[in-house]
């Protein structure tokens, strides 16, 4: 069983184009499920008015105690778990994927369970992969889009967490602010899965690791070179490198490096080789995987023209893949802007594994959901 560590991220501004995130230790786990069985007492206790403001801290602490006591977990950061647990989840993903691919539909561990999926940021892959996977394993998923729920605006996140916990067995959220996912996990009495924040994208990296195991035979000890913006995908690769040993290189323009504290955390773990490079051709030499993502993420589209200029020379094209060598695979978390960060030729090449990678979102997430629910 993995060791679970909680984190808090404080946001301050560094430069003009991205937040600087400082991780600090913070214990935030959760509260007991409420029994619906009738009380043995002959008369009900008198009702009292409870102040949400006054009770927020004790409630969060009791949520932590109960969630841990019930064997439930959150999936917020890759490095909340140890290497043994990460590999165990990936093994389970392969096992359940094989079962589903065989056409067997008798494995239904989520029968009678519901999941709320909060989407502050829309996503085809995240919605369909979670909803389909949960359904195939017997559960029912509920989509909550920006018009259904506005955490921190129409309703406080701590209230959303408590309400949804009383309706559901699990909550998945894809949000902008990393603090939103931390608050959901803090106040929810059911497991919370991070479907993406501006800081990290742990479910994607689990799918990536699964894809590498299938195509390379392993991901431990490989060389992964990410070419592009030092964004949430990079942060998740760095957090994985703090748990599992491999060689990770982020090749990005100056001024677009990943969060310095996260880089330092990965280096301090002392198990992986971590490099930040500004020379993509040199960086990709000997790579097992060349990885790319959009240059302007959701919420940065007004910077698209500026970023295209800044990222000249960082497009993944055939010349760059040739520099990587014949064993290199190409990966992309999608959606891709073909002709911008990657050429159409590379996406469609035999060494491109972007579509198996996309499929593995569902299989990796199925295993994550099984793990957090103690199945």
Swiss-Prot record:
Pfam families named in the record: OTCace, OTCace_N
Catalytic reaction(s) noted: carbamoyl phosphate + L-ornithine = L-citrulline + phosphate + H(+)
Chain residues that bind L-ornithine: 232, 293, 297-298
Biological process according to GO: arginine biosynthetic process via ornithine; citrulline biosynthetic process; L-arginine biosynthetic process
Binding site for carbamoyl phosphate: 123-126, 174, 201, 204, 333-334, 361
Alphabetical keyword list: Amino-acid biosynthesis, Arginine biosynthesis, Chloroplast, Plastid, Transferase, Transit peptide
Active site: 333 (proton acceptor)
Keyword Repeat: no
Classification via SUPFAM superfamilies: Aspartate/ornithine carbamoyltransferase (SSF53671)
EC assignment: 2.1.3.3
Cellular compartment(s): Plastid, Chloroplast
Main location: plastid
Entry GO MF terms: amino acid binding; ornithine carbamoyltransferase activity
GO cellular component, one term: chloroplast
Signal sequence extent: none
Family the UniProt entry places it in: Belongs to the aspartate/ornithine carbamoyltransferase superfamily. OTCase family.
Subunit note: Homotrimer.
Listed name of the protein: Ornithine carbamoyltransferase, chloroplastic
Gene it is expressed from: ARGF
């Amino acid at each position: 069983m993995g060791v679970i560590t909680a984190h808090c991220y404080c946001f301050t501004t560094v430069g003009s184009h991205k937040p600087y995130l400082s991780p600090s230790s913070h214990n935030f786990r959760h509260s007991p499920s409420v029994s619906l069985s009738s009380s043995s007492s002959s008369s009900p206790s008198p009702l009292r008015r409870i102040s949400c403001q006054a009770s927020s801290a004790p409630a969060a602490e009791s949520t932590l105690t109960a969630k841990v006591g019930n064997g439930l977990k959150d999936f917020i950061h890759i490095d909340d778990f140890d290497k043994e647990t990460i590999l165990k989840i990936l093994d389970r993903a392969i096992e359940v994927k094989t079962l589903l691919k065989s056409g067997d539909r008798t494995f239904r561990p989520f029968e009678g369970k519901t999941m709320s999926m909060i989407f502050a940021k829309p996503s085809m892959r995240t919605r369909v992969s979670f909803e389909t996977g949960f359904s195939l394993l017997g559960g029912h998923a509920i989509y909550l889009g920006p018009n259904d729920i506005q955490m921190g605006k129409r309703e406080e996140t701590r209230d959303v967490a408590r309400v949804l916990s009383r309706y559901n067995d699990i909550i998945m959220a894809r949000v902008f602010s990393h603090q939103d996912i931390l608050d959901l996990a803090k106040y929810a009495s059911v497991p919370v899965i991070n479907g993406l924040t501006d800081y990290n994208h742990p479910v994607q990296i689990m799918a990536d690791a699964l894809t590498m195991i299938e195509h390379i035979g392993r991901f431990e000890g490989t060389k992964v070179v990410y070419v592009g913006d030092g964004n949430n995908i990079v942060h998740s690769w760095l957090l994985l490198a703090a748990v599992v040993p491999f060689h990770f290189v982020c090749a990005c323009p100056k001024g677009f490096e990943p969060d310095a504290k996260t880089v330092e955390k990965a280096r301090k773990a002392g198990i992986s080789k971590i490099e930040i490079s500004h020379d993509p051709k040199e960086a990709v030499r000997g790579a097992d995987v060349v990885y790319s993502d959009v240059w302007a993420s959701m919420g940065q589209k007004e910077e698209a023209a500026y970023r295209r200029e800044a990222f000249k020379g960082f497009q993944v094209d055939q010349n760059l893949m040739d520099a990587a060598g014949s064993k290199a695979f190409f990966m992309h978390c999608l959606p891709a802007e073909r002709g911008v960060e990657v050429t159409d030729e590379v996406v469609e090449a035999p060494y491109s594994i972007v579509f198996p990678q996309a499929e593995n979102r569902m299989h990796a997430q199925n295993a994550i959901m099984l793990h957090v629910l103690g199945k």
